[in-house]
């Protein structure tokens, strides 16, 4: 008796949904990159310039972290899709062996 139940079609559907979520997130981050990394100082004083530079640095760091997170997300989606295919192939092989 198996204690693990895997439904390949559900894994594949989850991979598709996660792929869509990842693409939307990447697009949103790309759209936010220019306005957040190019913060214009509100005034011509030194404090405003330093504050704007500080915000721009944080935005650049966010973009870097987001790119790494997107890469990890893509690897996870690929692994999930591959697992769905593997489970489906195993089910077919087990059904053929049982016949």
UniProtKB/Swiss-Prot annotation:
Stored Pfam families: PE
Location(s), subcellular: Secreted, Cell wall
Superkingdom per UniProt: Bacteria
Gene3D superfamilies (UniProt xref): HP0062-like domain
InterPro entries: PE-PGRS_N
Cellular component aspect of the GO annotation: extracellular region
SUPFAM superfamilies (alphabetical): PE/PPE dimer-like
The UniProt record lists the keyword Secreted: yes
Residue ranges constituting the PE domain according to the UniProt record: 1-93
Induction, per UniProt: Expression is positively regulated by Rv0485. Induced by different stress conditions such as surface stress, oxidative stress and acidic pH stress.
Keywords (A to Z) from UniProt: Cell wall, Secreted, Virulence
Family: Belongs to the mycobacterial PE family.
Function: May play a pivotal role in the interaction between M.tuberculosis and host. Can enhance the survival within macrophages under stress conditions such as H(2)O(2), SDS and low pH. Increases the production of IL-6 and IL-1beta from macrophages, and decreases the secretion of suppressor of cytokine signaling 3 (SOCS-3). These changes probably involve the p38-ERK-NF-kappa-B signaling pathway. Also precipitates the macrophage death.
The protein, known as: PE family protein PE13
